[in-house]
């Protein structure tokens, strides 16, 4: 009663209440999972990991080859190099410096041991109800800053992609369901990767039904273009929709249609679109992997400047929104912007 009284000062918007009720119905109904597939996937992964660990011990002679400190020492002794780090960004450099087949093989094994192919399968087994359905997979207003739906338990909003053909996927699924590791290894090279691709197939509809999955295409780029009324971008989305190519052409004053897939300029357009649409700068480019993509440090700031110059309406929107937020805080009164 006391909680209700406190919350009464903050009434739920009329349009939000039906959404919340709908969310509750979805969570109460739950989603079916193939527990047989999940169980066998976990078992197969355990066998693969045990094999890799034995191979690592045999190759290195280490008691615990999963220990970063022990492995760094082994690489230094084997290849005669100094190893500062074995994090993801450093591995390519370590391989190049070592130039050693044994080190390459051990780093491959280490990558295999670190794969988390079955974490979501384990989560399914932990959270499934007796009827084989998982409930509570989404949380209404779960994200702290944005208020969007948040994934819970198995985190369905972040599932590995299926990259193999449907026929191969079906074959792999049948073999995993049967626990047939021997045939699986005959047909597929990367067992851990195959298990990852099968995660989506572990969610199953009721008999006679199908799951229809859809996603928004370049949703962040579309929304910011619409909010800011960046005309050239909206024209791109009205027509061919190739925003990476169009962005590169706009930024570097290239003829329309001149940038194609595989063009280095498209790569610059892509990283700029991914990192810079919402006020990001050099730090955002680095976080999105610009340096790993082959861009030089000296290219980053000019890339930021080029993108902002090509998108003046979006850049103006940022500063207008910033000024409105400051004004609202200072005056304690709402500030209306063109989009709301």
Regions from the language model: what does each represent?
Residues 16-19, 263-270:
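Short, leucine-enriched amphipathic alpha-helices that occur as contiguous helical runs
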Residues 188-189, 210-241:
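Structured ligand/cofactor/substrate-binding pocket environments in proteins
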Residues 191-198, 202, 261-265:
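Active-site-proximal segment of RNA-dependent polymerases
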Residues 268-278:
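Short, amphipathic alpha-helical "recognition" segments used to contact nucleic acids or chromatin
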